């Protein structure tokens, strides 16, 4: 960062020198108009040159007085415009003060940042401060306005101070009053006035530029120790003895000029590096080639030569090999002026230095210069950025460079603007007058012949090398000794114009005109025109001249006389003073010639170095914005993270940032300060001899290997200390980062440990809950197993009780049979039966009869018995005994089936006790046969048993009750189990099996009613058949009337036929029965009453109806059936007497709301009906046992079950 700041300040220093040169060459007032003269085309320039021939040029020889004083081109203004001019100056002064007030505030802030090492907040994040971007025109306007305002202010202040001092020193100047008055009396009044007014612009501007430079140099010189001798400090008085005794010059002004002279000599002894002086601080010594070469464009028009007013006789043309810089020109002008006697013709006052500088005034000027320097810093950065954006090339190869276009400088205000016009010219007469004779005795001699080549050499060096290098290629060196143009007579004194001297001074010439040498001498203050337009570039300050001993009053008087400030009461300068100037000038020329020989060699080395640098020149400049990023060695930078860290470090430590300027052709040599340090020592010992030379201004680096200066060593130590500080800071930062990472890792480990502990705890709690759940499930399973075991034991106990009860009943039955058998022994034997009937009876004894067989045998026997005569009572008893034997065998067979069925049911319940399904699902192959055909053929049909999980509680309970009902042993239930071996699993299968059971029971009821209505002669057979089918043997008609099975609803047969309600009058009385022939015919036709069919839809259509699968309707029906059956069970029924058996029709009417109930609503179809009847018959059986085991006509459990079936 220190190197960056050094180079930045050095660039600003060079910029300041360039601005002062521009101020001297181009008037700010005209720059506000647009510098039209510099931007005109070639044709316009030619027209201007032709028009200027008619103007009385100041370059022509003007009439001289007896003292040889020349008068410039400037014409006097009219008396009428003096007030207006002063008013304009006052307004400009006020504007400048307002502008300066604002600039000082900003400059102080910037100075504070520079002095304290802080960074301007507006420039954070960038290498150099970047202010607002203004166009070139706006920047030039602002700059010219500021410079011109300063010029006017300085001019007014200088004039006022001179007048004040004049009053104080008027007695001392009386001795020189007469010669001056005599010299001036020979001149016309208007010339005297013009001469007086012509001093203002350039003299005031000279003083303003010098004290600005003085401020900056004194400020920089105060920062480091310098070896300054008395000889250097008092060089002004030694070199200008003729002015020491001059009268009418302000004392303060003399001290200021003296201080400026001291600084100028020190500055001119620098290493001739453009913009770099010996008194400059080390940080200002690094300047890019951009600034160095760009300054040359604006330094050719400086009027230093005209102000210093001398011509070197030893200044031989060097062709374009010599490169000129603005700072060198400044140093030449500062040191070279009073050396020869020919200065009386050119400008005797040029180069004069006055007495010592007031310290207080120096401090104020230093502060002012610092403020102006800060203002120039931002402007310089803008220009450099613009140069970079426009790819402005480095001007090192001259006019023959094929890579550079001739008009590349036009974009920097060197081309004419369409909205700007040529400046108006000063009014002049239309004819020329001959110059006045040079016959004055006090006129100085004509300069020697060698002085002209010296001037032409300087002019050629300024135009040929600098202008030819940067401006148009057609600008060539001018002749060495051009003939002077004709002189113009001064205009009439009464011709007044509204323009002031500065306007005509800057508006009457083109500073870039290649023919500027033909302007002649005497442009301003009697100086030759070439020195006004092209500065003398290679003059250097000579060593102190000790031979001059005149007093300061005399030197001041000569300076005022030669500069154009002619006072009528001032004495003329002495000849000795002029001679001293000529001798000093000759000494300076000899010293410069020796120095130039050395500079040629250094220049050749420098050009070789530049050629090498051009080969590696990077046109992109600084990396970024599309250009690759490179480090100081030219390597590509691809680590953007490292660059980011570097930028952060530079932000926090801006002073320690290493400067890397990639915008220059090559990287800057950091050893350049060594050469400057050596030059500083040379400047301290400058007075050792005239042949002592300075280091080359083109040396870029430690060319001769000089050791480092104390300041450089101190800077290196500071840099090393800062590097150590950075290393330590980085180490501490890394340590803090590691500590931070360690703390973060500890926190993370702690968090993970807590998380692991929490997860472990949750896992253990989950395991504990799982174990508790498993234990609870195990206990529940044990409880279920225990309950199942209890149920199994209870079922076994009940089964044993039932078996015991059944055995007891059998025992009672056998005892009763034995009793009956014993009784029948005493009866007579019946008559032999028909063999056919005997065979049929025997066949019946062989196997248990089926339902159809029993019915058919019943009808056949009924018809057979009708043909016989009614038997006697003894015969009835015998037939009853035979029938009872048959019934015993059938009962035993049915009991065996019941036991097997109960055993299978219990085993199934035990196996599937813990499962969800009451009975396991058995997958069977799908039988293509119709389910009703299978039922008719007694073929077992596969039934899909859905899981009871999807059933509601009511349907599940109904299925359970129906399963208990279908497991009872009866003919209808046996046939149902044959047709549907699997119990129902849903409401659909439940409905189907209920319909099948209804059909079987309906057929059974039909048979019972047929036997009831058969007649009196069939009572015995009907009774025997009823007992064979487990029906009550006594009073069948009364039992059927009181039976719970009788209903008013229609019943569906096995084949889908429906039977109407059986009314009491459905069967005719015995007297109205058909004859035996009709009954035999009906028997042969198979038109049995139970098989009679009506033309009704099939069972499939009825079972597949919507009503058959209505779950809610089935549930409501089953609930209604269970409720009615419960009410019926609460009413005791006695089967012994006929009064206890009520009419079945009355029972059905009592159980139903009306006679319109369907078969599905009958109480006998309810799932609990069979169990209820079972309990009812058990109670009745107990009553029989109490009455007596042998009483005939009692009901048995099987008989009632068969009757219910």
Swiss-Prot record:
The entry's keywords: Cell projection, Coiled coil, Cytoplasm, Cytoskeleton, Microtubule, Phosphoprotein
Coiled coil: 12-34, 87-108, 357-391, 574-618, 724-813, 874-911, 993-1014
Keyword Hydrolase on entry: no
GO biological process: positive regulation of cell division; positive regulation of cytokinesis
InterPro entries tied to this protein: CSPP1 (IPR026708)
Compositionally biased tracts (Polar residues): 176-187, 685-697
Predominant place of localization: cytoplasm
Biased composition (Pro residues): 433-447
Subunit structure: Interacts with PLEKHG6. Interacts with ARMC9, TOGARAM1, CCDC66, CEP104 and CEP290.
Name of the protein in question: Centrosome and spindle pole associated protein 1
């Amino acid at each position: 960062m220190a190197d960056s700041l050094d180079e930045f300040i050095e660039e600003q220093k060079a910029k300041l020198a360039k601005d002062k040169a521009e101020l001297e060459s181009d008037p700010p007032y005209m720059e506000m108009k647009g510098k039209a003269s510099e931007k005109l085309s070639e044709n316009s320039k030619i027209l201007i040159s032709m028009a200027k021939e008619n103007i009385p040029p100041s370059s022509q020889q003007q009439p001289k007085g007896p003292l040889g004083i020349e008068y410039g081109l400037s014409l006097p203004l009219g008396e009428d415009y003096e007030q207006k001019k002063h008013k304009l100056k006052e307004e400009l002064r006020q504007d400048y003060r307002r502008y300066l007030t604002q600039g000082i505030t900003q400059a102080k802030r910037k100075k504070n940042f520079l002095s304290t090492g802080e960074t301007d907040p507006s420039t954070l994040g960038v290498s150099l401060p970047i202010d607002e971007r203004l166009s070139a025109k706006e920047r030039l306007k602002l700059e010219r306005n500021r410079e011109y305002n300063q010029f006017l202010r300085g001019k007014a202040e200088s004039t006022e101070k001179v007048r004040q001092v004049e009053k104080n020193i008027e007695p001392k100047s009386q001795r020189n009053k007469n010669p001056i008055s005599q010299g001036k009396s020979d001149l016309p009044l208007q010339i005297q006035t013009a001469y007086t007014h012509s001093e203002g612009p350039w003299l005031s501007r000279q003083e303003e530029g010098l004290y600005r430079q003085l401020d900056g140099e004194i400020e920089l010189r105060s920062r480091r120790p310098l070896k300054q001798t008395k000889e250097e400090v008092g060089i002004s008085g030694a070199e200008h003895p003729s002015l020491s005794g001059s009268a009418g010059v302000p004392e303060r002004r003399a001290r200021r000029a003296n201080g400026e002279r001291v600084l100028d000599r020190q500055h001119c002894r620098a290493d001739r590096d453009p913009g770099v002086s010996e008194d400059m601080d080390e940080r200002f010594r690094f300047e890019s080639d951009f600034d160095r070469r760009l300054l040359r464009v604006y330094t050719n028009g400086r009027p230093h030569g005209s102000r210093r007013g001398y011509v070197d006789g030893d200044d031989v043309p060097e062709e374009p090999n010599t490169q000129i810089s603005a700072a060198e020109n400044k140093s030449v002008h500062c040191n070279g002026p009073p050396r020869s006697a020919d200065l009386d013709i050119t400008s005797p006052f040029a180069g004069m230095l006055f007495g010592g500088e007031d310290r207080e005034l120096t401090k104020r000027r230093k502060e002012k210069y610092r403020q102006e320097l800060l203002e120039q810093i931002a402007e310089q950065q803008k220009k450099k950025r613009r140069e970079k954006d426009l790819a402005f090339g480095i001007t090192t190869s001259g006019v023959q460079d094929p890579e550079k276009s001739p008009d590349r400088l036009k974009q920097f205000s060197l081309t004419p603007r369409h909205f700007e016009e040529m400046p108006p010219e000063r009014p002049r007469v239309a004819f020329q007058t001959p110059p006045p004779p040079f016959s004055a005795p006090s006129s100085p001699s004509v300069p020697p012949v060698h002085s002209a080549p010296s001037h032409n050499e300087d002019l050629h060096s300024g135009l040929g090398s600098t202008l030819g290098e940067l401006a148009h290629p057609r600008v060539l060196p001018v002749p060495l000794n051009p003939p002077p143009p004709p002189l113009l007579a001064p205009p009439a004194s009464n011709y007044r114009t509204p323009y002031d001297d500065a306007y005509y001074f800057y508006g009457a010439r083109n500073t870039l005109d290649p023919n500027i040498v033909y302007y002649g001498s005497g442009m301003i203050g009697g100086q030759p025109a070439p020195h006004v337009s092209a500065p003398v570039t290679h003059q250097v300050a000579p060593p102190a001249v000790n031979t001059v001993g005149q007093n300061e009053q005399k030197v001041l008087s000569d300076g005022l006389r030669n500069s154009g400030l002619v006072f009528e009461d001032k004495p003329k300068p002495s000849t000795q003073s002029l001679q001293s100037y000529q001798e000093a000038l000759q000494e300076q020329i000899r010293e410069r010639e020796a120095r130039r020989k050395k500079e040629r060699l250094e220049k050749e080395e420098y050009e070789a170095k530049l050629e090498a640098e051009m080969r590696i020149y990077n046109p992109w400049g600084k990396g970024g914005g599309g250009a690759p990023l490179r480090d100081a060695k030219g390597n590509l930078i691809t680590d953007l993270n490292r660059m980011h860290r570097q930028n952060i470090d530079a932000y926090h430590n801006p002073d320690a940032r290493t400067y890397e300027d990639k915008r220059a052709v090559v990287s800057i040599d950091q050893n350049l300060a060594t050469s400057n340090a050596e030059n500083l020592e040379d400047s301290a010992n400058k007075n050792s001899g005239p042949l002592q030379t300075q280091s080359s201004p083109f040396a870029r680096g430690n060319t001769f290997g000089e050791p480092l200066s104390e300041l450089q060593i101190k800077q290196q130590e500071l840099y090393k200390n800062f590097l150590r500080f950075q290393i330590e800071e980085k180490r501490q930062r890394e340590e803090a980062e590691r500590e931070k990472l360690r703390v973060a890792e500890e926190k993370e480990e702690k968090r993970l440990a807590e998380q692991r502990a929490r997860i472990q705890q949750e896992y253990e709690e989950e395991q504990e809950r799982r174990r508790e759940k498993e234990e609870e499930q195990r206990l529940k399973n044990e409880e279920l197993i225990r309950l199942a075991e209890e149920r199994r034991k209870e079922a076994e106990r009940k089964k044993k009780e039932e078996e015991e009860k059944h055995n007891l009943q059998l025992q009672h039955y056998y005892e009763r049979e034995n009793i009956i058998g014993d009784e029948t022994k005493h009866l007579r034997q019946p008559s032999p039966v028909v063999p056919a009937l005997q065979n049929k009876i025997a066949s019946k004894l062989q196997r248990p009869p089926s339902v159809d067989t029993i019915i058919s045998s019943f009808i056949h026997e009924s018809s057979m018995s009708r043909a016989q005569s009614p038997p006697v009572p003894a015969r009835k008893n015998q037939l009853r005994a035979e029938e009872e034997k048959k019934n015993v065998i059938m009962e035993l067979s049915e009991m065996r089936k019941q036991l097997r069925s109960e055993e299978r049911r219990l085993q199934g319940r035990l196996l599937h006790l813990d499962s969800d399904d009451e009975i396991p699902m058995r997958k069977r192959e799908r039988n293509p046969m119709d389910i009703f055909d299978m039922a008719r053929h007694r073929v077992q049909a596969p039934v899909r048993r859905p899981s009871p999980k999807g059933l509601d509680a009511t349907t599940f309970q109904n299925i359970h009750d129906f399963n208990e009902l279908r497991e009872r042993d009866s003919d209808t239930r046996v046939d149902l189990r044959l047709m549907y071996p699997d119990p129902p699993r849903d409401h659909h299968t439940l409905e189907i099996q209920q319909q099948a059971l209804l059909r079987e029971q309906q057929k059974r009821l039909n048979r019972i009613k047929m036997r009831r209505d058969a007649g009196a002669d069939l009572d015995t057979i009907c009774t025997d058949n009823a007992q064979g089918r487990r029906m009550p043997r006594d009073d069948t008609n009364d039992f059927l009337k009181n039976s719970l099975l009788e209903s008013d609803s229609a019943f569906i047969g096995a084949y889908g036929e429906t039977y109407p309600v059986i009314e009491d009058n459905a069967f005719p009385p015995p007297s109205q029965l058909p004859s035996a022939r009709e009954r035999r015919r009906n028997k042969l036709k198979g038109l049995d009453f139970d098989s009679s069919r009506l033309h009704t839809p099939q069972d499939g259509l009825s079972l597949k109806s919507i009503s058959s699968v209505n779950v809610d309707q089935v549930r409501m029906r089953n609930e209604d059936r269970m409720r009615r059956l419960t009410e019926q069970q609460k009413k005791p029924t006695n089967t012994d007497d006929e009064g206890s058996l009520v009419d079945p029709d009355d029972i059905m009417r009592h159980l139903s709301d009306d006679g319109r109930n369907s078969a599905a609503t009958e109480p006998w179809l309810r799932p609990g009906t069979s169990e209820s009847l079972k309990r009812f018959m058990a109670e009745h059986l107990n009553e029989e046992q109490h009455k007596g085991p042998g009483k005939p006509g009692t009901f048995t459990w099987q008989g009632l079950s068969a009757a219910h079936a």
